[in-house]
Amino acid sequence: YYAMCTWFDETCGQLIDLLEKRNLRDDTIIVYVTDNGWSQNPERNGYAPRSKQTPYEGGIRTPIMFSWPNGDLKNGKRKDVVSSIDLFPTVLAATGARVPDGLPGLNLMDSLKEQKPVKRKGIFGETFAHDVTDVENPEASLVFRWTIEGKWKLLLTYDGEVNRYKSTHPRTEKRPQLFNLLKDPKEEKNLAKDNPEVVARLAAKIGKWWPVKERKVLTKWE
């Protein structure tokens, strides 16, 4: 794992050196994004639980970094909730192109240049059994869906087929999981039982975002 981190750092350096050698660095936007989190398991050569392939913060909360010397971006670390769906409208805005209406992502340029808060009410995501097994019917391997809105994160568990990834997705808790990410970033205390109105509201938003038809899910604490 650490060797891969070192290799990645070296190859990024080689790319930046090439851009500088060709006098392209100042006008080039570099965006770092990764597909999943990986918390190293100190006891073995692999990732820790609630990390890679899971819907918990250790698996989905990853950094996105922008670098653009001539773009007048403000240096700093932000904690806004953003997504890879924001990359397309952001790069369009950087080039001066018109950002079409109706895109699912947000243009982050104002935030990057002026450190304005990202105007996002909530964000949604889903997890499958490693990958979507059937692109014509993505529900077949749907395992989790979630939404993050403010301090709240609601995680719903579905009955999609996991096949050989059963050990990765044991789904021991099939009831809704609600976490206060500000107080409990490691998602150790499920607050769903004590906050049914929050669960109902966020579950309805998940259903509106992507209305699934075949999968079974519990949206109430039973």
For every predicted segment, state its role.
Residues K189-E197:
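Active-site-proximal N-terminal segment of extracellular/periplasmic enzymes that hydrolyze or transfer
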Residues L18-L73, V82-S83, T133:
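Histidine-centered active-site microenvironments of extracellular/periplasmic hydrolases
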Residues Y1-T28, G71, A94:
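A long, amphipathic alpha-helix that forms part
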Residues T6, E20, I60, F88-P89:
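Feature captures the catalytic ectodomains and active-site-proximal regions of enzymes
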